[in-house]
Amino acid sequence: MRRTGQRRGAQNPHTLGGRRAHGPKVEKIWARKLNQKERRLARDSALTATIDMEMVSSRGHRVSDEVDSLPIILGDYVEIKDGKSQEFDIESFNHGSATRKVIAIFNELGLGEDLQRARDGRKVRAGKATMRGRVHKTPKSVLLVVKEKSGLAQAARNLPGVDVVAAKDLNAEDLAPGGDVGRLTVFTKSALEELN
């Protein structure tokens, strides 16, 4: 029985100040399982949609008229010093003011408008999410698929709306955020080789 100053009876759900009758369980697993073949099929169909210029533009991405076909593939780059040329893998390029270099690369590829769209489209979210740390909502821009997350990946990850994914971790959610297929995607040559 309950004595004065003790709250032993308050553990019952039907007593005053008692616990909740059927509260949320910690053990509940919210992740949904998906068959491996279904997951692969979803990824492959989302990958196929990145090729279609119409689907990419209908998703809201802005690409300059100079871009003839999608997806965009970054090969090796050549640096010329003292008349000698050296070829480097694009993923391991020099880190000196690297994010500026990535912006310059994207502008040369005709993706500058889409980066600007993501930067300007950043809005303060409505509702209680702002109190929970999810203050801003940023539109998705370029998806950069690399072999390893170093060099180019580290330089591009801070751009608003740009997502960087290793080829082995590529999934349908990255290629079709919110279930809308046709994301503007840039692959590196080595990432494409790893995907095959």
Task: Tell me the role of every PLM-derived stretch.
Residues 1-9:
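Active-site cofactor/substrate anionic-group-binding motifs, chiefly glycine-
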Residues 13-196:
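Extended polybasic, low-complexity segments that bind anionic RNA or targeting/receptor surfaces
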